[in-house]
Every structure is written in structure tokens, then in C-alpha cells.
Amino acid sequence: SKQILILMTVILVIILGGCTYVLNKTSGQIYEQMSQMAQLYAQELDNRFLRISRNLFSTIMDTNETNSTFWGNVNLMKNGDYSEYAIGKLREEYFSSAWEYGTEYRIFLYTHDTDKLYQLSLSSDGNYTMSSDIAASIREQIDKLDEKTYAVKRKWDVLECDNEVYICKIAQKNGIALGCIVNVKSILEPFSKLSLGKHGYVSLVDQDEVCIGMLDQSGIISEPQSMNTKNTYTIRQGLSRAPFEIRIGISLGGVLSLMAGSLLGMTVLIFMILIMSGILLFHVYSNIMKPLKVFTQ
């Protein structure tokens, strides 16, 4: 019986060692997959930001304004009798942006002469409405920009309105401002279904290391808190087209949750191996060792 106990212990140690190796290998693969996912999403965001910036820049800085559809409609707006017609035409120009960028990216136009702001792209509700608070925040941001060519080259800025955080890109020329605004919630939303554990999070951090948006297991946090990096494995992925960085913190609970299938499979495997080993050893003891012991006595 002593030999059987030793043999069972050796088998158990070998099994546990193998399981530990598999778990470490699996957790490493999970971290690598999460890192690749963050990289792919950052590339998608960079591509989207680049296309939006190019559209704003090329449209507002069109040197041949006489042949520009955009400037033709903008100039038509100066005639009060045709302003509604001109806005309708501009909205037709940006109708496809809802599919190209997503309805969460809202294109807007602001005219200094009339102090009016119009949303040109379609919202998710099928309208062109923008809250007065957001419009006021955009006006304040436009006032901060100098009326110079380099203003269109500035990177995405952060706006706060009604406990919500937005990022905004604005290009302006000759008293006309053309821009795009998006809620940070929409940027973090694709990560909402990830299982990151109790202390896990996804955040958007600016170049000053300030967290401007955070998502944890409870959902989007309107007032981002300090990130718990002690109990998490942190993945950092910077954006090249905007001064922000995506950070993903995965806690031990999140890793175990993502490894649930592997853990369940290994538990069943260990249980089956132990049962089979026990049956085999009992058979060896009953049919070989016990008769041999009786014979030697």
C-alpha cells in the first residue's frame, strides 16, 4: 500500500506539473490575443481618424472655391432665401458618412457670421439634431482656435459636456468651421463584452497620462477613476493619428474567466486520470501484489 501511495503521488505531481505548464501557455496566448486585438482596433481607429481628417482638411482648404460644391453651398447659405436648400445639399454630401465612419461620428458646420451650427451627418436616431449643450461646447472650442491655416492640422481635442467626454477635430477657414465630434463611450464600446475580471478595465488615456474614458465590468464610467495596475496585466496600444492611448487591464479573474474552457477540460481530464489510475492500481494490487505477498509469506 505504501508503494501504491508513492506511485499515486508521483502521478499526481506529474499531472499538476503538466496542467501548470498548459495554463501558463494558455494565459500567455490570451495576453497575446488581447494585445493583437488592441493593435487591430487601434489601426482601425487610426484609419478612421485619418480619413475624417483628410476629408475635413481637403474640403475646407479647397483652393478652387468657385468649383467646389461645398463652398458653393456655403456661399448660397449667405442668401437667407436659400439657406435651408443649401443645408439640405450639404447634408446630402455627408449622407454616406454614417456608413463610412459610423453614426457616432458626427460631422458639423459652423458659420461665424450667423453664429449657427448645423449637424451635417445623420445620427443613429435618423435625425440631424444636436443638443444645445454640445453645440455650445463646440462653439467654445472653435473660439479657442486661431483663424490660421495651421488650425486645421491640430490633433483631436477633448471636450466635456453634461458628464460626458467627447473628442473633436475642427478645421476652419474664412469664418467657416467644419469638424467632427465623437463620444468617447463609442470608442470604448467594442470592448464592453470582454471578460476582464473584477479589477479589469479598458481606458482611453491622453498624452498627459490623463484618463478621459474608462470601461470596467459595470460598464462605461462617466467619471474615470485611477487605474488599478497592481492587480492587472496591462496592455498599452498608442494611436498614431490622435494623441491618445488605449490601455487594457486584465485581472486574474478575467484571465481565469477567459480560460474557463481550458480549466474545465483539465479538471475533467485530471479526474478521469485519477479514477483510471486508482482502478489500475487496485487491479494490480488485488491480482498481483496481494497474491505475491501471500505466496512469499
Question: How should these model regions be labeled?
Answer:
Residues 282-297:
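Membrane-proximal alpha-helical signal-transduction linkers
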